[in-house]
Amino acid sequence: MSERNNRKVLVGRVVSDKMDKTITVLVETYKKHPLYGKRVKYSKKYKAHDENNVAKVGDIVKIMETRPLSATKRFRLVEVVEKAVIV
């Protein structure tokens, strides 16, 4: 049961919500260059399961690792941290 507590939790921005019950989340991380010490930005996109289609493009969301839900989905939506500002 302790395995359940070791799941990855990531925070990112929704870049696509065109699929039904699926969102694409862009997660940006910073790593320090091993030799020069400069912080370098890395970004990766994850597909996440959004059961009720609550997340929209531009929202900041929290996703959690889960069992494989499809060929590419390995995460599910936990909560919408911040709604996007519509201009």
From Swiss-Prot:
PANTHER family for the chain: 40S RIBOSOMAL PROTEIN S11 FAMILY MEMBER, SMALL RIBOSOMAL SUBUNIT PROTEIN US17M
Annotated family: Belongs to the universal ribosomal protein uS17 family.
Keyword Ribonucleoprotein: yes
Name of the protein in question: Small ribosomal subunit protein uS17
Highest taxon listed in the record's lineage: Bacteria
GO cellular component: cytosolic small ribosomal subunit
InterPro entries hit by this protein: NA-bd_OB-fold, Ribosomal_uS17, Ribosomal_uS17_bact/chlr, Ribosomal_uS17_CS
Organism, as annotated: Anoxybacillus flavithermus (strain DSM 21510 / WK1)
Single Gene Ontology MF annotation: rRNA binding
